[in-house]
Amino acid sequence: MYIPLKVTTDYSLLKSLIKIPNLINFLTCNNISACGICDDNLYGVFDFYFNCKSNNIKPIIGLNAQIFAKDIYLYAMNYQGFLNLLKINTLIEKNILDIEKLKEYKDNILMILPFSSLDLLNDVSFEPKLYLGYHTEEEKIKCLEITDNSVYVENIKVLNPEDLKYLKYLDLIRKEEPLNYTSNYYYDYKFIDKEKIKEVVSFLNVEIPLD
């Protein structure tokens, strides 16, 4: 199994069925050595971080932000990057995040721009650590035509494939059109470049001080 970079947890209200304790158990049982959560807030970070540390799993801390209603995934490269994520999260809560404010806190942040948000590529080109994210083979081909910095990212919202059918009810509660959830998130597709995932993971090293 590959290292997941974009797990959405139930801290993202009505967007996921994944609870932190269940996620940690899944990672442990499947010998997955690192994992990234990337919610639309940072409320679950400490729960996730310390549970990972207690189980010898490398915690990767991300934040799913939006610019012009397009998703961008922001990851802390170190503790300073984590502090910048906290500042960005505050801007999100105040509904005042824009490109210029994002530039102010770009240091020590790695950004993954999902394929669905490629329209933002020119706007976010200021980011020194920028990757494009794909989740199909066709998207991978198109991303690689732009840059070698392209990495597999699947927005994981369930741990068991049989639970996929329940996600549509969360969509309905949020009064959104239900999506067709058919992916087997943890199947190792041949087109996944695991080495590129490891490269990204190697940049993300947050240590949160206890004092």
Predicted regions and their residues:
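Active-site-adjacent beta->alpha loops and helix N-cap segments on the catalytic face
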Residues: I18-I20, N41-N51, E137-L144
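Helix C-cap/helix->beta junction micro-motif
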Residues: N55-I57, I146-D148
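Charged catalytic and DNA/RNA-contacting regions of genome-maintenance
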Residues: C143, V151, V158
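Conserved active-site carboxylates
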Residues: M1-Y11, K19-C35, I57-G62, Q66-G133, ...
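Generic short alpha-helical segment signal, independent of protein family or function
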Residues: F50-K53, T90
